C-alpha cells in the first residue's frame, strides 16, 4: 500500500489552484435532506425561552396551586423528567434518532435562579404506571411531529462525507454520538449532523471543506479512493478544519492482516456497477418473502421462514421483520389476538425459529392511542386502546408463551429496532450453531438458560420477561 507521502503531486496542485482562485459560488449549503437535524433541547438556544408542552385540563389546577404559594410562576417539570432511567433513556434515544426535541431545561436554566430565587415545589415521586405513561406520551408526541425545531445556530456541526451512500459514515457517527448522550441532552451540548454522499470529484470536495471552515465544522469522511481521502486530509489541513478518516485505518489494518492490497474503488464507481453478489439477491428475496408474510399472511409458508415473530398488536413485529429482512433473513410475523386461534402451521414448524415479543402495558396503550388517532377512530367506541383490553391481550400472550417455553420472549419496551434485532440474531445463530462471525471470547457448547420473571403491579401480571444469559 502507498503511504501518505507518496501521494501524486497533481492533487496538491489542484487543491492549491482551487484555494488560490475560488469561484464566486464556491460555498455549498448544508444538505437540505439533513438540514435542521439537531440533537439538543431547544432551551440551548441563547435568548430563547424553553417552550413547554400544552398541559391538559386536569393539570391546570395543580399548576395554579403550586404558583400561588410562592407568589411567582414556577416552571413545571416536563413529563420526560419523570420515570425510571430506562424510560428516560428511551425518550432521549428517540429524540436523538428523530432529530426532535425534548423539553428539558439546561444547566443555565436550572441554575439561573440564584440564591434569591424561590425554591421550586417538588412533586411526589410518580408511580411506575405514571412514569411509563409520561415517557410514552413524550415519545408519541415526538412521533406525531410535535416539537420539530429548526436549525440551531449555536450548535456544533459535523460533516459526514462519503463517495457512496454514506451509510457507514452516518451509522459510525450516530454510534459515536451515543457515547455523549449525557451531554447532548442533559447538559445541552448542541450538535448538527450533515451528510454529503456521492462525493466523487475534487470540486465538490473543496466546496464542502470550505463550507466546513466557514461554519467551524468537524469533517468525518469515508472515501474508498486513497487519492480522494488524501486530498481531503490536505484540504482540511490547509483550511484549518478538524477532520478524521473513518474508513482508512480499518482498510489498512485488514490489508496488513490478509496481505492483500485494497482496490480503492468507491462503491459509486461505474466499474463496480453491475457486480451484484449472491448476498444481494438473497437479501432481495428475503425482503420480498417478509413483505408477503406480514401480519400472519400465508401461514402455509411459515416453514420457509428463518425467523417467526409472534406478539400482540403494536409490539413492533413488522418493522423488526423488515429490518431483519434487509440483513438477509426471511421473517414471518404472526399476531396474537384474543378469540382467534394461532395458525396450526405455527406449531408444526421448527420451534427454535419462533420468538415472542412483549411490551409494558402502559407504553402499549400510549402507542395504540396514537395509532387510533392516526387511523381516525380516536373518539369512536373501541376497546383497542383501553387498558383493561391491553392487559387482557398481554396476559393472553403470556399464557401462550408459558405453554411454549422454548420460545424466547424479548421485552421490547424502550428498545430500538436495532437492539431487538441484535438479540434475535444472536439467539438464532447460537441455536443453529451457524454464526460465522468470530466471537470475542472463546466458548465451548454454549448453554442458554431462560429465567422467567413476572412483575406484579396492582395485583395484575403486567408482563413476563425472559432474559437470555450465556454461560
From Swiss-Prot:
Protein name in the entry: Probable pyruvate, phosphate dikinase regulatory protein, chloroplastic
An annotated GO cellular component: chloroplast
Reactions performed catalytically: N(tele)-phospho-L-histidyl/L-threonyl-[pyruvate, phosphate dikinase] + ADP = N(tele)-phospho-L-histidyl/O-phospho-L-threonyl-[pyruvate, phosphate dikinase] + AMP + H(+); N(tele)-phospho-L-histidyl/O-phospho-L-threonyl-[pyruvate, phosphate dikinase] + phosphate + H(+) = N(tele)-phospho-L-histidyl/L-threonyl-[pyruvate, phosphate dikinase] + diphosphate
Region annotated Disordered, chain positions: 1-133
Organism: Oryza sativa subsp. japonica (Rice)
Compositional bias annotation for Polar residues: 71-88
Principal subcellular localisation of the protein: plastid
Bias (Basic and acidic residues): 100-111
UniProt-annotated location(s): Plastid, Chloroplast
EC primary class: transferase
Superkingdom, taxonomy of origin: Eukaryota
Compositionally biased intervals (Basic residues): 89-99
Transit peptide range per the UniProt entry: 1-49
Biased amino acid composition, Pro residues: 21-32
EC number of this enzyme: 2.7.11.32, 2.7.4.27
Transmembrane domains' residue ranges: none
Annotated ADP binding sites: 171-178
GO MF entry, a single one: protein serine/threonine kinase activity
Family named by the database record: Belongs to the pyruvate, phosphate/water dikinase regulatory protein family. PDRP subfamily.
Pfam families for the chain: Kinase-PPPase (PF03618)
Assigned keywords, A-Z: Chloroplast, Kinase, Nucleotide-binding, Plastid, Serine/threonine-protein kinase, Transferase, Transit peptide
Activity regulation, per record: Regulated by light/dark exposure.
Keyword Plastid: yes
Protein function: Bifunctional serine/threonine kinase and phosphorylase involved in the dark/light-mediated regulation of PPDK by catalyzing its phosphorylation/dephosphorylation. Dark/light-induced changes in stromal concentrations of the competing ADP and Pi substrates govern the direction of the reaction. In the dark, phosphorylates the catalytic intermediate of PPDK (PPDK-HisP), inactivating it. Light exposure induces the phosphorolysis reaction that reactivates PPDK.
